[in-house]
């Protein structure tokens, strides 16, 4: 089985940051990316379990995968158009 998290185009380590900083950093990073590129987000703020999926829905990015059972949390998104 392929680890979806193993080959992202970009990686953002947001560990140690608290709401709203992780989502602000994701938004800033996504702005520099090309459509279709992927971003691995590593975070430990419990609020990201709600905020990252909500950000993806609101901004029309695809949340490809998420692991939130244990710290650090990992999210993989693909930039939309």
Swiss-Prot record:
<dbReference type="GO" id="GO:0097163">
    <property type="term" value="F:sulfur carrier activity"/>
</dbReference>
<comment type="subunit">
    <text>Interacts with IscS.</text>
</comment>
<keyword id="KW-0819">tRNA processing</keyword>
<comment type="function">
    <text>Sulfur carrier protein involved in sulfur trafficking in the cell. Part of a sulfur-relay system required for 2-thiolation during synthesis of 2-thiouridine of the modified wobble base 5-methylaminomethyl-2-thiouridine (mnm(5)s(2)U) in tRNA. Interacts with IscS and stimulates its cysteine desulfurase activity. Accepts an activated sulfur from IscS, which is then transferred to TusD, and thus determines the direction of sulfur flow from IscS to 2-thiouridine formation. Also appears to be involved in sulfur transfer for the biosynthesis of molybdopterin.</text>
</comment>
<dbReference type="InterPro" id="IPR036868">
    <property type="entry name" value="TusA-like_sf"/>
</dbReference>
<dbReference type="GO" id="GO:0002143">
    <property type="term" value="P:tRNA wobble position uridine thiolation"/>
</dbReference>
<feature type="active site" description="Cysteine persulfide intermediate">
    <location>
        <position position="19"/>
    </location>
</feature>
<dbReference type="GO" id="GO:0005737">
    <property type="term" value="C:cytoplasm"/>
</dbReference>
<comment type="similarity">
    <text>Belongs to the sulfur carrier protein TusA family.</text>
</comment>
<comment type="pathway">
    <text>tRNA modification.</text>
</comment>
<dbReference type="Pfam" id="PF01206">
    <property type="entry name" value="TusA"/>
</dbReference>
<dbReference type="InterPro" id="IPR001455">
    <property type="entry name" value="TusA-like"/>
</dbReference>
<protein>
    <recommendedName>
        <fullName>Sulfur carrier protein TusA</fullName>
    </recommendedName>
</protein>
<keyword id="KW-0963">Cytoplasm</keyword>
<dbReference type="InterPro" id="IPR022931">
    <property type="entry name" value="Sulphur_carrier_TusA"/>
</dbReference>
